[in-house]
C-alpha cells in the first residue's frame, strides 16, 4: 500500500495479511446486497471498481444506485462543494472519526436521510424521480 493511502485510511500491509481476497469477498457482498438499492457517496468510483471485477467473477451489480454527491447537487444546486465533509457541515452532521469504512458508511447514511426532506420539497419522492434528477447533474457525467 502507498504511504498516502495508509495516512488516510490507517490500513497497513500487515493488516491485510491473511485476509480474504476481493475474489472471495465480492461474491458474498453481491449476495448480501441483492434486491436492494445501493446508497453511497461519489459512488461512480466504487461502481467502476465493481464493474472491473464483474466479468472475472461472473457477477453483475445491476441494482439501482443512489449517490449522495448527486443528490446533494440536486437538493443544493447553488453550493460549490458536494464533498461528504461539505455536505455534513452544511446539514449539521457531526464529522466525528472519518476515513474508515464504517464511519464513512454511517456518515453517508446520515447525509442521505437528511437530504430526503430537501428532495421532497422539490417533488422528488420516489426512487425513479431521485435517479432521474441525479442523472441531470453535472457530476453524473464524471467517469472513472
Which residue stretches match the model-derived regions?
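Conserved catalytic/binding loops enriched for acidic/polar residues
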Residues: 104
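Conserved beta-strand -> loop -> alpha-helix junction used to position metal-binding or nucleic-acid-contacting
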Residues: 60-72
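Acidic two-metal-ion nuclease catalytic site recognized across multiple nuclease folds
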Residues: 109, 113-144
